[in-house]
């Protein structure tokens, strides 16, 4: 929230006869997927009122590797995840080839849950039920591109 909207000065709420102030030590943290085109109009309003911090996908980063290890994921699967999604995200970020751009890169959170089955099945389920539908939406009119990348990351 803007600094001039914080502190001891209270404002009367529009729909209730109540005074309200946001304390200086209260922070509002929200998350937004910038790839969601339906948020575009709201996005401009939010950007005027809040500070934004972009979180980069953590593929290839030590913290992500350590998290996967702590969840019991093998070194070979960690390498597979990182290699596949670094390559896919590099392609997605190249707007000229992908038609998308860096705001459409796939985040690491899909792989942050502890595997609840064999890790190959865990990975295959994430690809089939999380990643593939997203790629099909991204490239809804380019089935060959979806097929190509599904073949590369399976």
PLM regions with names:
Residues 1-154:
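C-terminal regulatory/interaction module of P-loop NTP-utilizing enzymes
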């Amino acid at each position: 929230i803007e600094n001039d909207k914080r502190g001891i000065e209270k404002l009367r709420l529009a729909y209730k006869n109540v005074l309200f102030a946001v304390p200086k030590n209260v922070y509002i943290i929200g998350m937004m997927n910038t790839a969601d085109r339906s948020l575009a109009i709201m996005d401009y309003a939010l950007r005027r009122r809040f500070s934004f911090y972009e979180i980069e996908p953590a593929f290839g980063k030590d913290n992500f590797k350590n998290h996967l290890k702590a969840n019991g994921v093998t070194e070979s699967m960690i390498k597979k995840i990182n290699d596949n999604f670094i390559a896919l995200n590099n392609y997605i970020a190249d707007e000229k080839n992908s038609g998308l751009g860096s705001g459409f890169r796939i985040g690491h959170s899909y792989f942050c849950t502890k595997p609840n089955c064999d890790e190959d099945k865990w990975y295959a389920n994430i690809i089939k039920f999380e990643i593939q539908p997203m790629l099909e939406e991204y490239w809804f009119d380019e089935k060959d591109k979806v097929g190509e990348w599904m073949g590369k990351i399976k």
